[in-house]
Amino acid sequence: MKRYFNMLAVSVLCSGVMLSSCTDDIQIGTLDESQYDNVKELKGAVRDANNGKTSTIVELRKKDYSTAVEFRLSRVPKQGVDVTISFDAEYLDTYNAEHGTSFKLYPADKVQIQHDGKIVMAPDDKSSYSLDLIIPTLGTDEFEEDQTYLLPLKAEVKTDGVSVSKKESHCVYLVKNLAGEGNTDRKPGEKETFFFFEVNDTNPLNALQWKMEDGRYLVNYMVLFAANINYDREKGEVYIYTNPQVSYILAHNEEVIQPLRKRGIKVLLGLLGNHDESGLAQLSEIGARDFAQKIAAMCYAYNLDGVNFDDEYSKDPDLNNPLFARPSTVAGARLMFETKKAMPDKYVTTFQYGYMGGEDYVDGIEAGAWIDIAVANYGSKGRPMAGMTKANCSGQSTEMARYGAIAVSTAKDVAESEYGYYMVFAPWAANNQGSKTQFGYLSNLSEGLYGCRLIEPKFYYPTTTSLKTNPY
């Protein structure tokens, strides 16, 4: 894994300006202030107080989900502001129509909002105090397994002079009921791990062998590395290519992927360039929209938790092809934006390398709305973009395949930082000395992040069998 001035003309121009200023009357107080209207306007928005986002994925197992909501203003209001945050059942149809989804409505009578959703902001408050929000887990008779339920909250301002757009007035929670004995929960303030599994060498099920002394699993997010973006010249379309190992894992979804998910490990499809003119950061808007639909279709078909983008190994595109564009951070951001739009209840993550992860906005929407996690290259820290914080980024990255070592102190530095993730690439898991050495480093990671070491594995899962399948 791995960017004269022509002094005579200026003089003449300045002279012209000076001469005209001598003959024209000086006008005072005629400044057009309309250009500052947006600066003066007082705007509001409702957000999740913990992550600052308008859309949050919630996975329910055996415990209720607790978070908080708050109302934010673009500037100090200089007056008291009254706000009410409430459940908005009517927003379901609007949301589904905008995203092409078929989510169901989370039961309104189960939602618990502190103080009945009422907020009073002081004249010098830009952000309100937080209101606790409880999303209870429900029984299987009320809650279908793996069905996404929309919990839409709406902010209504009772005070004149505060404008709230339709989009900024809503904060949604995409709630899933996940059956199984999930045990990857982190305590408040604890960081999460983000692993890339080189599936050509390592069976993903080995993540179940890395269990901490307190009974929790070490791996939070697992990227199946990797499927590829490719171009079919005969059909004239961009598609997802899966090599024999990735094909086998997808075909044996219930035996390989779902056991991980049922224990709380989020499984993501890795996407990588593959030595042709298609590339993750060189698709046109049309090309990005089409490819995003293919990504979403695959994630839904195989019940994956999302996708990770890695912009490497692509050739220069044919700019006469309407599916392609010049490689750029703008094109990379467009693909992530379209992918999140196509599957809002899935995770969209990026390896901040090449042209992926370098734009703050797409169509005026900040990156935090369409990037869930950004992990950095080795020796670097993730860079939060608009709408993101360090908590959405990795604070350290280690490549195990090249004998990358992890010290307890390194992991502890991340644990004590503002960053939210520790990234590990290509860990081995086999009955050999190299894997045993790596296991010691992973145990150091566990101790540094969580204060306890890993339990020695009793066996390892062998590498998966190859299987050739058709491109998706």
Locate predicted features.
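Secreted glycan hydrolases and related glycan-binding modules that recognize and/or cleave
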Residues: 23-82, 88-110, 120-472
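Hydrophobic alpha-helical transmembrane signal-anchor segments
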Residues: 9-15
